[in-house]
Amino acid sequence: MGVFTPELELLHKWEIQTDTSDEGGRILENIHQSFRSEGYSPEDTIGVGLGVPGPVDFNTGILNGAINLNWMHRKPIAAEFESLSSMKAIVDNDANVAALGEQFKGAGMGHKDVVMVTLGTGVGGGVVSNSLLIHGHGGAAGEIGHLLVDYDQRFQCNCGKKGCLETVASATGMKNLAMFYHHEHKGTRLDMAIENGTVSAKMIVEAAQEGDALGLRVIDEVAQYIAIALSHISAVTNPKYFIIGGGVSRAGRILTERIEAHYRPITFPPAYENTEIVMAELGNDAGIYGAARLVKQYLT
């Protein structure tokens, strides 16, 4: 959580525990009370920006469920928060908010057109064009993790389909690939972890960094699938920066160098000219900067 001046200078930031009991019924009240306990009141506040881990109708502030917060049904987040706090609120998907934060204050600072790809348990993203987030008519713009890139459609996605970027480029996707190719790479340092079901993305990255053949194959294939997705996005939005964030991005240059190597040969040249693939800079602070930016753009 963070508090900003009207000029979007960060004054104060802090964290609170997320209480998902009682179907997440205390979450918004706890946010409100935390602001009050830090000494902030509605009279001091232009508005509050909220990033939530689920699909949002940006125009209405209604969240279409967020399993991680135990919100299993549609929830009018903006209206509920305004009612209990007497403060204006604006709500967006957390990946969108992080993308806007990185564009405004992080790796994309100074440029109006950026795309962020967040590689975690799943794959999220946000598209910023002319300094504004693109939401689409139903709020699904930026769902980069559900671009079809694995044309063999080997792995099931949580969305119900197969072949999504999320199935081959997230932490889960890395495990999918390691298990899929294990039979071709016996003797890898990942043998035991794969056989007992404990293999993780972190293990795969570390194996690749030490030259393990299976680890390197997985990293290279992940990079190839990300490059396919970025190539498609380039032809549509032509961003200055692709910003790579999330836990999987901690692989660093071993991943981004391979993404770059696969990206340019398959991309329309005018769409990749002067486009850079960079790492996110703000970490967890991207969300608060993006939320503050939303307030500035839409509530002032």
Task: Pin down the residues of each PLM region.
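Gly/Thr-rich phosphate-binding beta-strand-loop-beta motif of the actin/hexokinase/Hsp70
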Residues: 1-11, 116-130
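Structural signature of FAD isoalloxazine-binding scaffolds in flavoprotein oxidoreductases
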Residues: 140-144
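General beta-strand structural signal in soluble alpha/beta enzymes
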Residues: 89-93
